[in-house]
From Swiss-Prot:
Main location: nucleus
Complex and partners: Component of the TRAMP complex.
Name of the molecule in the record: Probable E3 ubiquitin-protein ligase HUL4
Organism: Eremothecium gossypii (strain ATCC 10895 / CBS 109.51 / FGSC 9923 / NRRL Y-1056)
Pfam families: HECT
UniProt subcellular location: Nucleus
Chemical reaction(s) catalysed: S-ubiquitinyl-[E2 ubiquitin-conjugating enzyme]-L-cysteine + [acceptor protein]-L-lysine = [E2 ubiquitin-conjugating enzyme]-L-cysteine + N(6)-ubiquitinyl-[acceptor protein]-L-lysine
Enzyme class: transferase
Name of the encoding gene: HUL4
């Protein structure tokens, strides 16, 4: 067998070993080279054109370019009944042995089961065709797969299970099949059907134990070594699917059981966490060049990667790092016992640490498939995708590099639209490319970082213009309004300051002496949004069946009214600007929109579930119609492609609209009922509100222009705008972060009474207190602990009401004589407080 090696880049280890075609007697060098990507790590490699396979020098997997055709014998498949029969025979023999013989001969007794596995693991096809589900929407019968692993795990000997893992590793290392260009193997699964065997391997139950270094029966050094090898290759293969196969994978993931789906998300996230911990332990080492991959030998002989080898040491690789990082504080630590490299307290992962780390990149790509599936069919909260280790990434540099890579990619595509050659960059991967890994708090930090830069830039430009023109130019966006005309005054002020919307916002209420340090701004947002949702404006409608708000349907004659001062178009534009300013100025709004509203802002595709959330009764009736398949369908429903809706100002007036050309004369039949439902949803979620939503969108993105907004999904945007959706206030957590001034402390009687009263309040009353103190009745998306809550002492006036400084989230309490007096004064203050003035 002949080999060929070639350096692609002299700076690193971009060399590949080309394995000659086994059918060729000799290897003829060819000067014509082509590029192919590794089907495991995704590295782009250059190789001679006339070879059938080569070995990747990064992950050491053999990439097959021209696979061998195999025929599948059904008798070679894994069959649980056959395995149980073999197991029963082995158990009978095992039970007849005495205690000493059981210990000495257990491997021999269960050798039949080991042989059964070995004969079916020569190629990928027996495993690939096993455990089929009767459900056409599922790729695997997960109950059968679970039973298969249970049989192997519960054997008196671990050897059959270990042999299975070794065989899996060999198949992953040398699949003998061209996985880069898969061909359909089953009409049911199409292209993705060739990867079923990898999905079965990913169900191995000890993977999480390996990553977390948990105590378990199969958590010996050899098991950890082989299971890690299997896992990293399996993750790599599933992350490097071609576009068509990836779409098919996402389709099947949408129908996966929720508990299995959540388990996969957890596994891949643990895999990413493991490799960040590994990077931490290799900082400052020559092997940490971004492409080093620990092999079997590393696990078997390294105390660092395999801590159990040093039984006297209390340091466990992953366990230790989880304690360090997940505790929220990075403590100084050394990467090994004899290392002189000590990490700083404020250590952050640099993009150079992980930017070319293929394990993290492939893990993130696989998690992306799961995330996309979750966006279409909600399986788990988006917070399940957050990786806490990512909180210790240098997010500012990652964000800047992400923007640079995006510009470089766009420039490359524009200049080399006809070129298919690979593009090289010092850092090929940033966390911002997979923003679902960032926690919401980190995304808000990135948004605030970019917002602060834009605001400072706008203020700087205003100052420079003032110097050039010798004029006074305000560095703030100042809006001066009257309470009774808050919408009109705000619209006029915004129209006159279109170029200043990215400046820091300052609000002034006419005839009120308050100085805006944050509180007036919150009050303005609250009053303005409340006025915009007034039914008299006709901008939004209340949907009784869901108790949510939605854009009013614009009648055709009103398109003429979409122009001019105070028109619907201008008010929608104003609402968009207000929403953008609220995000820019970190202010929470009380909005009652469905998830579809935030999906449309983020450009996400709407689904049937979005329609059901907004119109649950209508949607349920539609689904019942779709289920009915009787011959008398048209007689029972008697529908046409037409809909009707009330006028937004006069509900007694009804408007009719056709869902398609000549819809009023086209009957809904069994054949076209699905198209009818699709057009119905499209009308109410898109077409009917298009003019108003487009005006809103223009206003919103006139303010929100930065790239950081692209990091947020619809669920996160809703939390960013409206705060946490929790239906209770965690009083103990709020108390733990509260600061005291003026002589109060946590043990002061008045303070203790205050917390007792707050705990006894119902949630609506608690929200009123939050609004009284902070200017908003919603808890921030990042939790109640991020509210800088303060309680101050006022020594005189024990018969007066409590005061608040919403600018500073501060409540001022007098020295009340008892708890009931404080309770009564608080209730009066909460019910009757509005406006700003001297007290």
């Amino acid at each position: 067998m002949s080999f060929f090696s070639r350096n692609i880049n002299s700076k690193d280890r971009h060399k590949i070993q080309i394995i000659s075609n086994s059918t060729a007697p000799s290897f003829e060098p060819n000067n014509e080279f082509v590029t192919s990507s590794c089907c495991c790590c995704g590295t782009i490699l250059q190789h001679p054109k006339n070879i059938s396979k080569f070995r990747c020098s990064v992950c050491y997997v053999t990439v097959v370019l021209q696979g061998t055709a195999f025929t599948q014998d059904k008798t070679e498949l894994f069959d649980l009944d056959d395995m149980r029969e073999l197991l029963s025979s082995c158990n009978n023999t095992y039970r007849e042995l005495d205690k000493d013989e059981k210990r000495l001969r257990k491997h021999e007794v269960f050798h039949l089961l080991e042989d059964y596995i070995a004969t079916r693991m020569v190629t990928i096809f027996p495993l690939n065709a096993s455990f089929e589900s009767s459900n056409p929407r599922e790729m695997l019968d997960y109950d059968q797969v679970k039973e298969f692993y249970r049989i192997l795990m519960e054997l008196p000997t671990k050897k059959p299970f270990y042999s299975f893992l070794v065989a899996c590793n060999e198949l992953l290392k040398r699949p003998h099949v061209a996985l880069n260009t898969p061909t359909p193997t089953n009409p049911k699964y199409k292209r993705i059907g060739l990867f079923r065997w990898i999905l079965i391997i990913l169900e191995v139950p000890i993977f999480k134990q390996t990553l977390a270094n948990a105590e378990a029966r199969c958590n010996t050094p050899h098991f950890r070594a082989i299971s890690y090898e299997v896992l990293k290759k399996a993750v790599g293969y599933m992350s490097c699917l071609d576009e068509a196969s990836a779409k098919e994978l996402v389709h099947f993931l949408k129908y996966m059981q929720k508990d299995i789906f959540a388990s996969k998300v957890e596994l891949v996230n643990m895999y990413i966490t493991f490799h960040f911990a590994r990077i931490l332990h290799t900082i400052g080492k020559e092997t940490n060049n971004g492409k080093y991959s620990p092999q079997l030998e590393d696990f078997e002989h390294s105390e660092k990667l395999n801590p159990s080898l040093n039984q006297g040491s209390a340091k466990k690789l992953v366990h230790t790092n989880m304690n360090i990082f997940f505790g929220g504080i990075v403590r100084p630590m050394t990467s090994s016992a004899n290392s002189k490299d000590i990490l700083a307290l404020n250590y952050r992962f640099s993009p150079e640490d992980y930017g070319n780390e293929w394990h993290i990149k492939t893990g993130a790509r696989l998690l992306l498939c799961l995330y996309v599936a979750n966006q279409s069919a909600y399986k788990c909260p988006v917070s399940n995708f957050y990786n806490t280790m990512i909180d210790f990434v240098d997010y500012k540099r990652d964000f800047e590099l992400w923007q640079d890579l995006s510009k470089l990619s766009a420039s490359h595509e524009k200049e080399n639209s006809g070129s298919s050659g690979p593009r090289y960059s010092p850092v090929q991967f940033t966390i911002c490319q997979c923003p679902f890994l960032f926690s919401l708090g980190m995304k808000i930090s990135i948004l605030e970082y970019e917002t602060r830069r834009l605001m400072e830039y706008s203020a700087e430009q205003a100052f420079l213009k003032a110097l050039d023109r010798k004029q006074v130019v305000d560095v703030y966006l100042k809006i001066r309004v009257r309470r009774e005309f808050v919408t009109t005054d705000s619209l006029r002020s915004i129209q006159n300051q279109q170029k200043d919307l990215k400046k820091s916002l300052r609000i002034e209420f006419v005839n009120e002496p308050g100085i805006d340090a944050g509180g007036l701004r919150k009050e303005w947002f609250l009053l303005l949004t409340r006025d915009l949702f007034n039914p008299n404006n006709g901008l939004f409608v209340y949907v009784p069946e869901s108790r949510l708000c939605w854009f009013s349907i614009m009648e055709s004659i009103e398109h003429e009214l979409l122009q001019g001062e105070g028109s619907s178009s201008e008010l929608y534009y104003l609402f968009g600007v207000v929403l953008g300013l609220a995000i820019y100025n970190s202010t929470i709004l009380d909005l009652k929109f469905p998830r579809a509203f935030y999906k449309k802002i983020c450009g996400e595709v709407l689904s049937v579930n979005d329609f059901l959330e907004l119109y649950p009764e209508t949607g349920t009736n539609m689904l019942k119609m779709l289920e009915y398949d009787g011959e008398d369908f048209e007689d029972i429903f008697a529908l046409t492609f037409e809909t009707c809706f009330p006028d937004r100002f006069d509900e007694s007036k009804i408007h009719y609209r056709q869902l398609c050309p000549d819809g009023s004369t086209q009957a809904v039949t069994r054949e076209n009922k699905h198209e009818y439902f699709r057009l119905w949803m499209d009308f109410y979620l898109n077409r009917s509100i298009a003019p108003g939503f487009e005006s809103f969108r223009n206003g919103f993105f006139h303010v929100i222009e930065g790239n950081s907004f692209r990091l947020f999904g619809s669920e996160e945007l809703e939390q960013l705008v409206c705060g946490s959706n929790e239906q209770s206030l965690d009083v103990s957590m709020l108390r733990s972060v509260t600061r005291y001034q003026g002589g109060f402390d946590d043990n002061s009687p008045v303070v203790q009474w205050f917390w007792e009263i707050l705990s006894e309040m119902e949630y609506p009353q608690q929200r009123k207190l939050l609004h009284f103190v902070t200017g908003s009745d919603r808890v921030p998306a990042t939790g109640v602990t991020t509210i800088p809550f303060r309680i101050s002492r006022i020594r005189s006036g024990a018969d007066r009401l409590p005061l608040s400084h919403t600018c500073f989230n501060e409540i001022c309490l007098h020295e009340y004589k008892d708890k009931e007096t404080l309770r009564n004064k608080l209730i009066i203050a909460l019910e009757e407080s509005q406006g700003y003035g001297f007290r």
